[in-house]
């Protein structure tokens, strides 16, 4: 599950960076056309050098972003190769990457049920540690009671070289052991095991609370980045329209060149914001998937022991229903003696 989330994060990071390069190149092309027009007007004496240098500065600044983004793209590709167990280099699966980011279906989570938390391996591990430590109390308490052992032996002896047995001996009987004089040590051991149980219970609670926090944080990010998508999309379209109007009014002499440069900057900024928010929304969904232990749909938790392993173990030993029992979420501590 963690590996799947890591692969998804790197993959969509790669696709986002590809789109950022595309946005930068498109905006650089727009700014280059403005620079060419401004340079021609400057040579004809119709524009000042200030307008020319401003157009050149904006164009070159945007163009300089492309190598940086291309470097990030290669790093993401190499990271993805490493996760997939490959040497750094081309990843054939990335050759046919679709251009737009996918649309994520609406995620609805009304609460965080306990069964959802129990999907997480850290929470399940903490729960099993509680169960294991709870059993240690019973083991320690068993020393309060006497232990009965059945002993027996059978022997033969012979005084001849042929080895024919002449004397046969059989002995059998019970043995009783009771550490009655170690009562204080036994009591303190029970207390020690109970204290350790309480410690594992607190660790389990902390694991569950941390898991619930991570799920809630990721869910909030999913909701809020989703709410931003429509306004940012409209803002980017408005920026495109604003640039078209600015270019038209500038050519007709109603606006100065600064307004055109401003419109170009706004278009680049809004296009980047829309893309980065879409990417953040996908990342939030991946984080939610990971925080919820593999999804948020209420489905049965995987078996404690895989079927094949369980069958092998049951063939060796009579386990009863222990290997099929659900994972305990809490344990009864009992009273320490």
Kindly give the residue locations of the regions a language model identified.
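Periplasmic alpha-helical coiled-coil/stalk elements that build and connect Gram-negative outer-membrane
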Residues: 1-112, 221, 225, 245-248, ...
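Sec/SRP-type N-terminal targeting helices
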Residues: 3, 26, 50, 54, ...
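A short glycine-centered flexible hinge/capping loop motif at secondary-structure junctions
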Residues: 42-46, 250-254, 291-295
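Long amphipathic alpha-helical coiled-coil segments
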Residues: 82, 86-87, 287-297, 330-332
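Small/polar, glycine/serine/threonine/aspartate-rich low-complexity segments that form flexible
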Residues: 90-109, 115, 138, 151-191, ...
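Generic long, charged, amphipathic alpha-helical segments
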Residues: 234-247
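Short histidine
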Residues: 256-268, 299-305
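A contiguous, mid-protein "functional segment" used to position or interact
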Residues: 271-311
């Amino acid at each position: 599950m963690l590996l799947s989330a890591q692969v998804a994060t790197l993959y969509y990071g790669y696709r986002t960076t590809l789109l950022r390069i595309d946005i930068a190149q498109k905006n650089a092309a727009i700014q280059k056309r403005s620079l060419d027009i401004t340079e021609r007007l400057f040579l004809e004496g119709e524009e000042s050098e200030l307008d020319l240098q401003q157009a050149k500065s904006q164009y070159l600044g945007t163009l300089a972003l492309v190598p940086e983004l291309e470097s990030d793209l290669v790093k993401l590709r190499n990271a993805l190769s490493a996760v997939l167990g490959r040497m750094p280099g081309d990843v054939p699966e990335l050759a046919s990457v679709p251009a737009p980011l996918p649309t994520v279906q609406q995620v609805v989570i009304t609460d965080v049920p306990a069964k959802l938390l129990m999907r997480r391996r850290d929470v399940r591990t903490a729960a099993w540690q509680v169960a294991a430590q709870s059993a240690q109390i019973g083991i320690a308490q068993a020393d309060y009671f006497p232990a009965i052992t059945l002993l027996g032996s059978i022997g033969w002896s012979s005084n001849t070289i042929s080895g024919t047995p002449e004397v046969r001996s059989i002995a059998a009987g019970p043995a009783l052991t009771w550490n009655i004089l170690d009562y204080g040590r036994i009591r303190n051991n029970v207390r020690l095991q109970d204290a350790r149980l309480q410690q594992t219970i607190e660790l389990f609670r902390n694991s569950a609370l941390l898991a619930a926090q991570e799920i809630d944080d990721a869910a909030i990010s999913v909701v809020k980045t989703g709410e931003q998508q429509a306004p940012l999309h409209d803002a980017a379209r408005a920026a495109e329209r604003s640039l078209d109007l600015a270019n038209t009014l500038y050519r007709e002499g109603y606006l100065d060149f600064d307004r055109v440069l401003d419109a170009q900057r706004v278009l680049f900024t809004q296009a980047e914001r829309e893309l980065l928010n879409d990417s953040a929304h996908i990342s939030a969904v991946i984080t939610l998937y990971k925080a919820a232990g593999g999804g948020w749909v209420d489905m049965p938790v995987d078996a404690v022991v895989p079927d094949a392993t369980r069958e092998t173990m049951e063939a060796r030993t009579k386990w009863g229903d222990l290997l099929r029992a659900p994972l305990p979420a809490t344990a009864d501590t009992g009273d320490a003696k």
